[in-house]
């Protein structure tokens, strides 16, 4: 029992800074929405539309680079720190290539926005302008993620937290300058949010690089000489590890986007109630997602040390802590669901529906916690391909079709509206959680030599 308590302390020490960093990132989005809304409703809507296209694109790149964390953690655990600098350099090359692709996609996203049914031309122009300003931040964001993943792979999660809050503090005044046109800058409205956010991502990257250059704990990595040229073999391995994670993230984001589109014809009350429950669940999701990042680090580090039993301990501890957290957030959600809904909207019908959906959200949180931590464990084992297959099957083969049938058809019961989609979420996430646990169990039952060989690739 003592080893699990010790491991839980280590996991929480890693996870808490990640949680705070994620809160800072979420707050940046909130600040953009509020400040754009303060300028005009059209500008706020433009930021929302632009963000809905930006997120799937940038999260794809983000997921691809997550492969660095277990790679660096495993090298650190095995004492092969001299190889870390080369992996990081290749991570920067990969981030640069992906940035160019993302920027090209976002530059041409105007075709998607203008093809939306009945969209106001002025709104479309502002949304396109916002995206074309924001896309210049894509390299800064992805370079920052490479540097952050280097730190986190070395079990240094506090720098990412600090840079997140630096970004938030810079974002507010820079937003103000570019939205309203102060200090000689043009008045850009919602487009100014894109300019500010792009600038902030570069500030965060440069601040992180400054930290890495000064950190004593990374002196040996910093001083390691090696080629700065692209290494096709290393980049291919990073892509092999990262692409399944990127696709899994992409399918998860697009699932919720598709459900939002399917709910939209049901009416304002249904859309608002669904959005409230989803937004609050997203806030609660920060906890298990951050714990999953910590579990990836610990499992990768233990495998690097050559201890499959300690890796199992880290995995099991992460799951136990995650279930405890999810149980607490579920109890909190059920107990205060009406009060939470009232924070978003005071329409009685909306509050009633949102409170009802939050009962389902409470169940959803437990399944979600298990599956996201399971995904973190598999990343630690470098078993990322299975994450993609599990996620795709659970969300798009089981979750979405069952949600659609329950919500909008009478094949099983009378159409349930948004509640049907939430039951679909539960079916999908519970299926993912079960499959993740079965895969983890299979991996952990392999001979130690095979586990360590797979982890060292």
Swiss-Prot record:
Residues that span the membrane, as ranges: 11-31, 53-73, 93-113, 127-147, 160-180, 189-209, 243-263, 276-296, 314-334, 350-370, 387-407, 418-438
Cytoplasmic side: 1-10, 74-92, 148-159, 210-242, 297-313, 371-386, 439-457
GO molecular function: antiporter activity; xenobiotic transmembrane transporter activity
Disulphides: none
Keyword terms: Antiport, Cell inner membrane, Cell membrane, Ion transport, Membrane, Sodium, Sodium transport, Transmembrane, Transmembrane helix, Transport
Ion transport recorded as keyword: yes
Subcellular location: Cell inner membrane
InterPro entries xref list: MATE_fam, MATE_MdtK, MdtK-like, Multidrug-R_MdtK
Annotated GO CC locations: plasma membrane
Pfam families: MatE (PF01554)
Family classification: Belongs to the multi antimicrobial extrusion (MATE) (TC 2.A.66.1) family. MdtK subfamily.
Function: Multidrug efflux pump that functions probably as a Na(+)/drug antiporter.
Protein name: Multidrug resistance protein MdtK
Originating organism: Escherichia coli O157:H7
Gene it is expressed from: mdtK
